[in-house]
Structures are given as C-alpha cells and as structure tokens.
Amino acid sequence: MSTDEAQKPSKTYDASCHCGSIKLSLTLSPPLEDGHKVLNCNCSICRRSGYLLVYPEKKDVTWHDGSRERCTNYRFNTKTKDQMFCGSCGSSLGIDFLNETYYGISARTIDGIDLDTLTYKKLDGLNKVSPAQDLSGTGTKEAST
C-alpha cells in the first residue's frame, strides 16, 4: 500500500432497512462529509427504488448477522445484478453487482446522515443507458421507463 493510500481519509457508516432486520456497515473514502460523490440516477430502477447510490468495495462492507442472505432480491434484463431490499419492510437497500467487486448501497439507508448536505453526481440513465427492454421475462412486454 502506498503512503497516499495509507493516509487517505475514510469513515465507516452503519446502515439498515427501516425495520432493522437488515444491518450493515460500509467504509467510504473519502467520507461523505468530505465530498464523497453520491450517484443520483434517473433510470427506471433507480427512480422507482429511490436510489441515491454510493459504491463501496465489497471488502469494505460488513453484513451483520446474516443480513445479506436475508435480503430479498430482484433481477431483470441481464440478471447479473441483485436489486436488494428487505422482505419485511420493503426498504430498497441497493445493488449487488454479482460479477463486480463493489456494491451500490443506497445512501438513504445510512444512519445519521443529512441527505441535503451530500455531494451528488447526476446520471441521465433514462436517456444514456441502454433500455432494459423486456422486464417481464416472457418476451412480450416493452421496457418501462
């Protein structure tokens, strides 16, 4: 590890669903308070899930007491991403990119942060990301945006 990496500021946050059944901790560098960018995307899944995403490495996320296994997952289109939510209270938790080394965790789940003070990066996913096309799995429905 280089000296720059060793001195890079980071902070660990606790996060959870609304009912508390799903709990995790994630470490971000730089910390949210120091301008860590939060993705605000307008694609169909981000809009409907209310996602404001941060992207910690999987090694920097700790799921407590089997919480990841208790997540309910939804997959569509390429079926390579789990949209994770709590099966009890329905809170949208984020995205498990199954073939990647990172998660997309919804900043809305992080305890004790003020969403109005965060630094956002907007993404026009509605117009710049390829449409999911058939979301039904039957080959008959058009994409819903």
Pin down the residues of each PLM region.
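A short Gly-Trp-Pro
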Residues: 1-16, 21-145
